[in-house]
Amino acid sequence: MKKIIATTLACALLTSATAQAANVTLLNVSYDPTRELYKNINGAFAAQWKQKTGDNVTINMSHNGSGAQSRAIIDGLDADVATLALAYDIDAIADRAKLLPKDWQKRLPQGSTPYTSTIVFLVRKGNPWKVKDWPDLVKPGIHVVTPNPKTSGGARWSYLAAWAYAEKAPGGNKDKAKAFVANLYKHVPVLDTGARGATTTFAQRGIGDVLLSWENEAHLALEEAGGADKFQIVYPSNSILAEPPVALIDKNVGRHGTRKVAEAYLQFLYTKDAQEIEAKNFYRPRDQGVLKAHGADFPNIPLYTIDDVFGGWTKAQQVHFADGGVFDQIYKPGQ
């Protein structure tokens, strides 16, 4: 009888130990204006993972300009996943730190971009400068707020959107595009390091007449208390297809033992539930059904692509944003 009791007790203890939930922590290193998005995504994923596995998962976040975040991971910031503003910033992690394979974009659908965005104009209520399109950003006396493309992914997308407009306009070419963008930056009084800082400069500090903004960030400014009474969004005649990618940081998840959860987390971003969250946070979902359901929030304007106009991110980075590149040639602080 004692033997039976002992065996039963041992089995019960073993079952209890097996059933005990594991506690897993991930670090998502993201770009500047994704705070609200990933707060909602993380809660939904944690609940789903708990239901599926019984384990508890906590996702910690780090936010900054995309270029700054890329350099931080290269320098040792221990990310399990990176959700940055553009592919070049993850390419740099693969090339310089060898933390993930160079073909990382092939591992998830749509080039590892579960959602897209674009660049729009946020202006003050009533649009006192009557801003309608890109040429209005160089009116005499107008001030434009945009972050520093050396540190901010959104700023690079904004710069390239302006360039694409000028190059592809009737009679446009690369020389005219360079002149237009150089003129545009003469109207920029301050360069913040990231998109959220630029939004704060415009919306809270009252600096500038136009904010070059991620679409989601512009909508967020309207949704904040009193925002709809202070600001309005202007969609230009065309803009750029911004594709913020996501990636597993292989060497880090290998050391942490978090690969399974981290992979599931990134795959979750493509699910219908997550796509709905992304749409509600004003990111354009890849799921066409979800996109159609939220169509009123996403005007259909022509969007140039990085590949078609600039030959991809590697070339665009080298030509425009590397030390001594076009941006360094045209931007003179205080001019």
Features from the language model and the residues they span:
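Short beta-strand->loop
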Residues: 29-31, 123-125, 143-170, 185-188, ...
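Extracellular/periplasmic juxtamembrane helices and adjacent flexible linkers that interface
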Residues: 253-335
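Periplasmic-binding protein-like
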Residues: 113-117, 178-185, 192-193, 225-259, ...
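Bacterial N-terminal signal peptides
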Residues: 6-16
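N-terminal segment of the mature folded domain
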Residues: 22-152, 295, 331-332
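Short helix-loop capping/hinge motifs at secondary-structure junctions, enriched
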Residues: 126-132, 151, 164-172, 252-260
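Ligand-binding pocket segment of bilobal, Venus flytrap-like solute-binding proteins
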Residues: 169-236
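Sec/Tat signal peptide C-region and signal peptidase I cleavage site
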Residues: 17-21
